[in-house]
UniProtKB/Swiss-Prot annotation:
GO terms for molecular function: enoyl-[acyl-carrier-protein] reductase (NADH) activity; NAD binding; trans-2-enoyl-CoA reductase (NADH) activity. This is Enoyl-[acyl-carrier-protein] reductase [NADH]. The active site is at Y235 (proton donor). Involved in the final reduction of the elongation cycle of fatty acid synthesis (FAS II). Catalyzes the reduction of a carbon-carbon double bond in an enoyl moiety that is covalently linked to an acyl carrier protein (ACP). Keywords: Fatty acid biosynthesis, Fatty acid metabolism, Lipid biosynthesis, Lipid metabolism, NAD, Oxidoreductase. It comes from Marinomonas sp. (strain MWYL1). Substrate binds at Y225. NAD(+) binds at residues 48-53, 74-75, 111-112, 139-140, 244, 273-275. The gene is fabV. Pathway: Lipid metabolism; fatty acid biosynthesis. The lineage of its organism: Bacteria, Pseudomonadati, Pseudomonadota, Gammaproteobacteria, Oceanospirillales.
Amino acid sequence: MIIKPKIRGFICTTTHPVGCEQNVREQIAFTKSKGAIENGPKKVLVIGASSGYGLSSRIAAAFGSGAATIGVFFEKPGTDKKTGTAGWYNSAAFDKVAKEEGLYAKSINGDAFSNEARATVIDLIKQDLGQIDMVVYSLASPVRKMPETGEVVRSVLKPIGQPYRSTAIDTNKDVIIEAEIEPATEEEVAATTTVMGGQDWELWMSALQEAGVLAEGTRTVAYSYIGSDITWPIYWHGALGKAKEDLDRASAAIDSQLAKIGGGANVAVLKSVVTQASSAIPVMPLYLAMVFKVMREKGIHEGCMDQIYRMFAERLYNNHNPAELTDDKNRLRLDDWELREDVQQACRELWPKVNDANLFAETDYQLYKDEFLKLFGFGVDGVDYDAEANPEADFEVITL
């Protein structure tokens, strides 16, 4: 079929398999161009492995460190009538290139919050790898089905305390609007922490450790975002921020458990990038359009792959000066360039000046739009979008 983008709100309902594969190949080529990661991991589990930072982590481990990887994700395959999710095509492409290069790669498609997923992963590790030495936790799901009760808990993107009013972009019409969001209730904050906090990460690490599949010196990392005062009301000081604080709590608990086997846990605080998750957050598209422009002008702009390679090579597996690599909460800070005062001050000055007439000129909004479409495999260089594409992509995957 000939596949074109169809956008509804902050989701593109179609995806392009060839474009997704090309995206993955570009990330792999970038990783290889940077060279091997010194002292990198060799057997890696990535929970949430099909897009964004999770996919980049799997690529960094496999193609930067020669690691065997197991990826867990929840995606829909394409059929002869309908395209699958981008994450399905990303994972199919990863599997294809990994196999071409003789790397071990196995994938599990199912609910990563479930006990079944944990049991399946543990069996697979025992059968194929014996033990693993790194666990990346990169889930960004709006809902969580509780493994014991089956209750479905939903997260919210809301402020705490008072309504949040701010300039934002209506990304369907490309115009500036005033967004207003009512504050979260106590129940909504608690639910958001249940879904987006550190509890599930702890369940995974406990299950893996109890099963004896974690090697001596195992490292684990989960991803967070703090941002600046521009986005704090909706993010760090909002319901999502409470969930991310819970991630810090979990990190400390897991770290003390892993210390028994000479390992450790960290939260990695990453920069803002265009992902399906970030496009759903009011204010983020406008902030991203601004911060991209400022960081590009200063020569410090990074995408998912750049960030994750830097995290592996310069933070997580940099054994030269470990004390300097974390902040006072033992977090790996990869948002250091974004949060530089000169970058944030430029964004603050730009914020009140942006209007409908100058949106494209004063910010990198076009880059934001391009990056958003690329998430779904569209607008990728070297892909013929007028050609027929096969929406069915099969690869070695265990479906739960």
